[in-house]
Curated annotation (Swiss-Prot):
Coiled coil (UniProt feature): none
Species this chain originates from: Granulibacter bethesdensis (strain ATCC BAA-1260 / CGDNIH1)
Residues that coordinate or bind FAD: 3-17
Any one GO molecular-function label of the UniProt entry: D-amino-acid dehydrogenase activity
Name of the protein described by the UniProt record: D-amino acid dehydrogenase
Gene3D superfamilies reported for this sequence: D-Amino Acid Oxidase, subunit A, domain 2 (3.30.9.10), FAD/NAD(P)-binding domain (3.50.50.60)
Gene it is expressed from: dadA
Flavoprotein in keyword set: yes
Similarity field: Belongs to the DadA oxidoreductase family.
Catalysed transformations (reactions): a D-alpha-amino acid + A + H2O = a 2-oxocarboxylate + AH2 + NH4(+)
GO biological process, one term: D-alanine catabolic process
Pathway recorded for this protein: Amino-acid degradation; D-alanine degradation; NH(3) and pyruvate from D-alanine: step 1/1
Length: 418
């Protein structure tokens, strides 16, 4: 079967890998000049199944109101005359109940755990290198109240058999020795030893190279204009290269997926949530993190990537605006200065922003659509890197007519019907 994938981010390329492994003829089209040049380019770098949680949670509406008055807020709302923005926020608020949070987190952990296992298998199969480390994730708490709020998350981790450790301050420093120089009080942390780190952009580039060696074609610099349809079937993709035809199509365009899908009557509830990152050259190994530390206070991830530190975070609802804002850089810098002072050359750091494709319930949209040969693999939010291999394998099995290894019906877009 000939399969055309729209999008060459980490999710699209992972999907291409698994489809090609099943013997399909695979073509990937993307407007950029190489793989992983959008959201996958400089994300926070963690592969964190245990930390997979929906943003929609009990208490979040009140937290957002408080955050909006803070100078180093992890959340920024730039209101627009945009029905999609307000509809998405309304749907997200509807998921801020205890029952919805438990349901959505369970979905996310299920897929993320599966994805981590698929990533390990892929690494064994290919020998791919991407500055990866298997040293776990440490969710760091500055207050006792933050620690007390982990009970529900721990219950979900237990239900899925996810390993975890509750640490006091000394335990946090034992796991991350650089924290001994922290400039702020530390109460404790939740360590997830099964989590990993790695450079998502490097992984995507290397996996694309492996795909090319296996016969996958990449059409870079290709603008996607829309779909041609006949009844319940996609007949072609209209593009800057003309009509691109295949037997099956996969939309893996991240935040841009809903703009294309609405042309054929599919309302994908995905909204771009801008995130920022800094990549800092390490100047003192002893002061630097060894893996990923999640600063719970500011919702910022500080990750070791080879001889660099990647600091990523903030959530800015500003539509498709990717402009860099220096006040967000100050937020990132503040966290790394407080937790890992003198670890890197901050003036030499690169500053980046990208759009995370967020769904209201935090769970990606994977599976079929009303068009029998169009499939979705999109809406992974902040967890595209964490969920990429599992999502790719899952959809490849579905397209190939194989029974997937995990439950998947609740990941399809049909959950938003009505």
């Amino acid at each position: 079967m000939r399969v055309l994938i729209l999008g060459s981010g980490v999710v699209g390329v992972a999907t291409a890998y698994y489809l090609s492994r099943e013997g399909h003829e695979v073509v990937v089209a993307d407007r950029r000049d190489g793989p992983g040049m959008e959201t996958s380019f400089a994300n926070a770098g963690q592969v964190s199944p245990g930390y997979s949680s929906p943003w929609a949670a009990p208490g979040i509406p009140l937290k957002v109101l408080r955050w909006m008055t803070q100078p180093r807020s992890p959340f920024v709302l730039r209101p627009k005359l945009d029905w999609a923005q307000w509809r998405w926020m309304t749907q997200m608020l509807g998921n801020c109940t205890a029952n919805a949070y438990a349901r959505n987190k369970a979905r996310m952990v299920r897929l993320a755990e599966y994805s981590r296992d698929q990533l390990r298998d892929l690494r064994d199969e290919t020998g791919i290198a991407y500055d990866n480390r298997e040293r776990g994730t440490l969710q760091l708490f500055r207050t006792q109240k933050q620690m007390d709020h982990t009970a529900d998350d721990i219950a979900v981790l237990k239900s899925y058999g996810v390993a975890y450790e509750v640490l006091d301050r000394a335990g946090c420093i034992a796991a991350e020795p650089g924290l001994q120089w922290a400039q702020v009080p530390l109460v404790g942390g939740l360590r997830l030893p099964g989590d990993e780190t790695g450079d998502a952009h490097l992984f995507t580039r290397e996996l694309a190279r492996i795909c090319m060696e296996r016969g996958v074609s990449f059409l870079f610099g290709t603008q996607i204009h829309g779909f041609s349809t006949q009844g319940d079937k996609i007949t072609a993709i209209r593009s800057s290269r003309g009509d691109l035809m295949a037997d099956a199509y996969v939309c893996a365009l991240g935040s841009y997926s809903p703009l294309l899908l609405k042309q054929i009557g599919i309302a994908a509830p995905i909204y771009p949530v801008k995130g920022y990152s800094m990549t800092i050259p390490i100047t003192d190994e002893t002061h630097a993190p060894v893996s990923t530390v999640m600063d719970e206070t500011y919702k910022i991830a500080i990750t070791r990537l080879g001889n660099r530190i990647r600091v990523g975070g903030t959530a800015e609802l500003a539509g498709y605006d990717t402009r860099l804002r220096q006040e967000r850089r100050m937020t990132l810098e503040g966290s790394v200065k407080e937790l890992f002072p003198d670890s890197g050359d901050l003036p030499a750091a690169t500053f980046w922003s990208g759009l995370r494709p967020m769904t209201p319930d935090g769970t990606p949209i994977i599976g079929p659509t009303r068009y029998r040969n169009l499939h979705l693999n999109t809406g992974h939010g902040t967890l595209g890197w964490t969920m990429s291999c599992g999502s790719g394998r899952l959809l490849a099995d579905m397209i190939s007519g194989k029974r997937p290894n995990i439950d998947h019906a609740d990941l399809a877009i049909a959950r938003y019907a009505g």
